[in-house]
Structures are given as C-alpha cells and as structure tokens.
Amino acid sequence: MARTTPIARYRNIGISAHIDAGKTTTTERILFYTGVNHKIGEVHDGAATMDWMEQEQERGITITSAATTAFWSGMAKQYEPHRVNIIDTPGHVDFTIEVERSMRVLDGAVMVYCAVGGVQPQSETVWRQANKYKVPRIAFVNKMDRMGANFLKVVGQIKSRLGANPVPLQLAIGAEEGFTGVVDLVKMKAINWNDADQGVTFEYEDIPADMQDLADEWHQNLIESAAEASEELMEKYLGGEELTEEEIKKALRQRVLNNEIILVTCGSAFKNKGVQAMLDAVVDYLPSPVDVPAINGILDDGKDTPAERHASDDEPFAALAFKIATDPFVGNLTFFRVYSGVVNSGDTVLNPVKSARERFGRIVQMHANKREEIKEVRAGDIAAAIGLKDVTTGDTLCDPDNVIILERMEFPEPVISIAVEPKTKADQEKMGLALGRLAKEDPSFRVWTDEESNQTIIAGMGELHLDIIVDRMKREFNVEANVGKPQVAYREAIRAKVTDIEGKHAKQSGGRGQYGHVVIDMYPLEPGSNPKGYEFINDIKGGVIPGEYIPAVDKGIQEQLKAGPLAGYPVVDLGVRLHFGSFHDVDSSELAFKLAASIAFKDGFKKAKPVLLEPIMKVEVETPEENTGDVIGDLSRRRGMLRGQESNVTGVVIHAEVPLSEMFGYATQLRSLTKGRASYSMEFLKYDDAPNNVAQAVIEARGK
C-alpha cells in the first residue's frame, strides 16, 4: 500500500497549556475546522471530544494525552492536505509525567496561554520540558474576548518569564467584548471570521486606520526577525529591498525550527476566531518528521554502539511506545510513534528492552476515543496497537532483524504514598489486577506490598494523582477502596566520611563454618552526581579477598540500602570503597561475605553523621492581593522558605519551597483562607536534610 500523505506534509504536534487557558476548547475547534467533528463539544458542559475519561469531564481538566489525527488544507485551501497528529497534554502539575512523555514523541508544539492570566507557573514547567527535548514551538494567546485580555502583555511575559524570544505573527483587533479579528503581520491585512458559519469562512480586509501605525511597527519587527535567518536576507533588508511573503515565511520557519524564535498568534477558540490561522501557522512554521534530527538509540551488540534512525519508510522499522491505556472494549491499547520504516497488522516486532517478541494484531488510529482500524503505519505515524502482551511506556518496538533500543524516557520517582485496601475481601484480587494495569499505563505511579504490615501501598506524584487512581479503580474496574493517611517518601544519607570500618561474619564451630571479613570506607556522594545514588569501588590488592567474593560484598551493601538503619527508608548518595579483608580457604562463601558487608555498612552508617532527607516541593500560589499576608503566614507555619513574589492582573504569585509533609490538606486550607479565590501548584524540587525535631518524630513513629 503506497503512502497517502508524503512525510513532509506530516505535523506531529502537542497542544500544551496551563489549566484553564482553554486548551481543550482550542483542540475541539481544530477538530471542527479540520472536518472531523461536526458539532463543537464544549468543556463547559462536559462534552469535549478530547477529554475522554469520565473524571476529566467531571473535573473539567485534561488528564490523559489522547492522540488524534486530522487533516488541514489551509484556511483559504491554499495547501495540499497536511496530516496533523495532535497529542493532547494535561496542564495539571500532578500529571507532569503525561506532558513529559508526549513531549518525547512530538516534533512541534503549540503553547496556549490565556490572554488574561498570561504565563502561569505551570506554563514554566511545561516550557522546561519542551526545552529539554528541544521541541520547536509557536504560541496561541487564547481568550481574547475575556475581561482584562491583553495580547501584547502576554507577549512580554513570554519574554520575561520564559526567557524566550517571542515574535508576534498577528495583532489583536480590539479586546474583551470588542475583539473582532486579527491583523496578519505577514500579509498586512485584517482577518475577519464569519460568525454565521462558526468561523469556517473569513474575509481579508484593510487594517483599521487607528491600528495602522502599531501594525507597521510590529510588521517591521517581524521582517527584522526574518532577515536574521541569513546574511543574504539581512543584506537585502539593509539595502532597503522588500522581502517577499515567501522569503519571510521560509526565514521564519527556519528560525522556529532552530528554536531561535517563538511565533505568537492570538484569538478566542470559544468565539471561533483565530484557531484557523493558528492551524495555518502549524503548517507554515512547525516541523515535519523530516525536519527534526534523526532519533538516537543504541545497537543491541553488547557494546552499546550509538545508532540512529531517520524518518524514512526505507529504513528498518523502529517505534517508541509512549502510552499504555486500558479501553473497556478492546483491553490494552499501546500508543506508539513510528520513527522509521513500515509495520503491517500481523507483523511480529521485537521489544529489545524486554527481549520479547510482540505480534501486531490490530492497529488503530485514534480520534479522541473513537477509533478507526488501519492495516499499516509508516514513519511519522502515531497509532495504537491492540493487545500487545508486555510493553511498558518508554519501550522500543523494532524490526527483529535490525535491533535498536531508542533513548528511554526518564520518569520521576513518586513523592507520596498511601495504603489502600478493598472495601470487601472479595475484591482483593480484582484490586491487584486493577492497580497492576494502572501502573503499566503510568510509570510515575508505583504499587507494592509492605512486607511488615502486608498492606498494599500506592505511590505517585501528588494527592490529586492518587485520588484519580482510586477513582479510576472504582469506575473502570468496579473496585471500591479505603485509603490510609498519605505518607512521605523520606530518604536517608550520610554527611561524613568514615574509614576502616570492619565487618566480620565468622561461625567456625564444628563442621563447615562460615567466614567473611571486609574493611570498607564510606563517604557521601554529591546529590544527583550518580544516577544510581550509589557507587562501589573495589580496591582490594594482592587477593586478600578472592575476586569471586567481591560482587557478594557489593550485593550485601546494596541490599542494606533498601531500608536504612535510621528509620528504614532507602539510602541515597552513598559511596563505598572496599580495600581490605580476609578469607578462609574452606569456610568462606558468598553468603558469609554478604553478611560481613552488611555488618560493616550498619556500623559505618551510624558513625558517618546519618541524616533523614525529606522531599521539598516548589510551591506557587496565586492569590488575590488582600490575602497575600495570610497566605505567606500560612506557608511560613508550614516551614516554607519564601523565594519571591510578583504581581499580575489577577493578584499576586507567591513562590516558596515547602516540605511535602507540611502540604497535606493544603488545598482545603487555602480555600478557606481566600474564600476559594486562590489556586496553587506544586512539584517536586529536591531532597533536603530534615530538621532534628522532624527527623526524631519520624524515626520514633517508625519504631526504630
């Protein structure tokens, strides 16, 4: 089967935004204008197509990044059809993982900002993730029809708060109630969309006389930005020659692809204005799969030889599974992005991460939660496979004869855990199944059984994250659960170096004995310097401990790291140097050396100034001005460190660093302090030493 759309006409994009910037409505309008959706779904009444999980419709926030395919031929039908694959990304901070994983498979992104609220704290988190994956992006300033809307103010914030280089592609004509359309700064024409057909048709008109000077000024700014793309254009521009529309667009595209500028458009998705021109900007300025660098990976040759795959049907098949979802009708759906090659339904592919073969039974392309079955997918496509057996988010799927392991995604460690138990004993097994499935979908969510209490523990990125997991168990798997009090994921570490710590395990009374003897140094590592948080150096000279026992020493220490001597929390940032010891020809064994190492570790840890580490959260609170004092006072009582504040149209944004243990129930407290007018977001920042009184209380509570 031949390719229907050339790969250069593909656009794999994400639509990313702060909560309430109107991202879902914007996506809905895109689906409407691209002809997929005949009736526009409004988030206000819970009917939007992209928000397909029930909780999202209730909470009015987008949780799961659904992938949707649409076609666009331009507002004035000026292009060949372009295939736009849209990945919807959530804006809530507890779902940062969803944003992260979608950024990994995008080629470009549209950042949606609210014309009133501007660049919010959450927008900065998303921006950092887009920077990390070097995603070219454009911005859409939405809600121009709202009270207090100000397009150029938001352009200024993109520069000051995100450190970006924004270049307006349009200007808003009017604002609030008087918002009627936009000025196209490339064509230097006003665009007015027709209300009667929900903005499907439009007219080019002259720029309003009272905006001519402003339009000239920003047109000049746009031309200068374009001219900076090459010396040739700069000479032409400085020589007083006019740049053609084609030259301007080509130059701006090049600068967007190089991540040098952010083109900014505006509109009101709700009022059917501006989304159509933003779609044109997606086609004109965002990359196709062939415009972005080839994807990197390593060969499965035992040497980790670097390799890459280019976006071409002729290269061997390679894809990345970026999301696992459970569908009530077909079971497991594995969303994947094809980077190279072609795969047909019925083909067998390899998952090199698990060394397992998988058969692609049915392949579907998703439109929000409706699906269309297809026979093949090619380089650049995003699709979902039904019924793959053992694939986790971040796994590679590739041609078994040309094995490559694509770069893995990085997932954050959970910072909060709670115990859960089913309301009825009969549901125990069902709960285990449900949690196992949900953990497969979401790598930032973990499940395990506490060995001492035998309770099931679930852990995630925040209270909302775990609330939604419990909620999904009830809705999707019919399992009602009771939940315990949230627990903080503390860590243990040392702050001093200790040397010549001895560990000896000797039992030599009759029969075959046991003998292991080690001497180690222990020292703290710089936090984050070692991805494993642990290093082991073997400095044994002259065979005082035979080589075959060295791994047992390492293993003996690693087993102790799982539950530290202070309060039973994992030990991090620790280095160990093994430099002396002794053995017995007959009585020594791996087990004896493992035990000797654990004795030395426990002794050394106590002497090396052990500390309890607690997770510190970056907290940002947006509050009306009159409540600022109360909010700051409350954060200080929670051991918060103030890191600054700034005013905006809607009030004051307070930046603070607060221990997670002090943030439980914060949403309720903030609501009562500000009569429900404040909002906050928090994300994990770092681990830091817990003060003595806090550490003492935690240690006593653990009964250590």
UniProtKB/Swiss-Prot annotation:
GO terms for biological process: ribosome disassembly. Keywords: Cytoplasm, Elongation factor, GTP-binding, Nucleotide-binding, Protein biosynthesis. It is found in: Cytoplasm. GTP binds at residues 17-24, 88-92, 142-145. The keyword Cytoplasm applies. It holds the Pfam family GTP_EFTU. SMART domains: EFG_C, EFG_IV. It comes from the Bacteria. The keyword Lipid biosynthesis does not apply. GO terms for cellular component: cytoplasm. NCBIfam families: EF-G, PRK12740.1-5, small_GTP. Belongs to the TRAFAC class translation factor GTPase superfamily. Classic translation factor GTPase family. EF-G/EF-2 subfamily. This is Elongation factor G. It comes from Pectobacterium carotovorum subsp. carotovorum (strain PC1).
